[in-house]
């Protein structure tokens, strides 16, 4: 899947991730089922203060680009915090991260968990595919069809691991 940043979607987080503006996809919401992530605890998931926690998926651990994305994201984060000289940051950003376009913000609306051991995607989705039409079949879970709930539905982090109870996918709508 392409690199992405995840936040809970609180206004303070949306404001801050807009300043970070890297990587190119910002996903707001959970869809997570196995325990709480650090960003879901107080003080981060709390409207009464300005503290923000973000989670970044930079890529596969073994992929050479993953380290580059991680460093570029950290540099953009420091730039947004205004704690490091901008020249220091610009001198260290990779060429593709120096002038990123406006990151796309998406809301996580659904989390799909396999009910059976017979869950299969209709295509070998890798993540960030946008399915144009509502009602498009994207998977089969036993005898149940899994359909997109709205037009322009983004598929976030499809999981091809087998097993009932496994989170298979998050569905997202443009913010």
Where in this protein do the model-derived segments appear?
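Structured catalytic-domain cores with a bias toward divalent-metal coordination
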Residues: 1-175
């Amino acid at each position: 899947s392409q690199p992405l940043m995840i936040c809970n979607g609180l206004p303070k987080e949306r404001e801050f991730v807009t300043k970070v503006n890297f990587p190119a996809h910002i996903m707001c919401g959970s869809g997570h089922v196995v325990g709480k992530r650090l960003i879901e605890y107080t003080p981060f998931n709390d409207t009464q203060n300005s503290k923000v926690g973000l989670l970044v998926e930079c890529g596969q651990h073994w992929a050479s680009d993953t380290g580059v994305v991680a460093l570029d994201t950290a540099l953009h984060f420091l730039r947004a915090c205004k704690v490091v000289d901008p020249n220091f940051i610009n001198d260290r950003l990779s060429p593709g991260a120096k002038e990123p376009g406006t990151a796309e913000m998406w809301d996580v609306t659904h989390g799909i968990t396999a009910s059976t051991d017979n869950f299969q995607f209709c295509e070998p989705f890798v993540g960030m595919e946008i399915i144009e039409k509502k009602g498009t079949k994207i998977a089969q879970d036993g005898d149940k069809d899994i359909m997109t709930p709205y037009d322009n539905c983004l598929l976030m982090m499809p999981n091809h691991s087998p097993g009932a109870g496994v989170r298979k996918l998050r569905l997202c709508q443009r913010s």
